[in-house]
Amino acid sequence: MLRLAMTIVLVALGTIPTQAAAPTAAQKDEFYRVCMGIAQDDALCSCKAEAALSLIDERFMDVVIASMKGGSPKAADYDAYNTYVAKSNQVCKPNY
């Protein structure tokens, strides 16, 4: 009974972690199109689009795509954005 009560309280407070949704196929396609417009490198853009699926979630994919289009990540996303760029470069540009 106590466990049920604690679960209800945590749900009400919004403190139970939820699993974020993976990026969508449409986001992956948009990422690839935007990347190709910048880099004109199929191997790199294909790799980065694929890597993004395992490195970031659906919300953050929008942050990345907006940044690729010239936007800046919000302050709260800045560290995560830099981490994403570093990890995707490790995967797709190992000698970078």
Regions found by a protein language model. Name each.
Residues 1-20:
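Classic N-terminal secretory signal peptides
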Residues 20-95:
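Post-signal/leader-peptide non-cytosolic segments of secretory proteins
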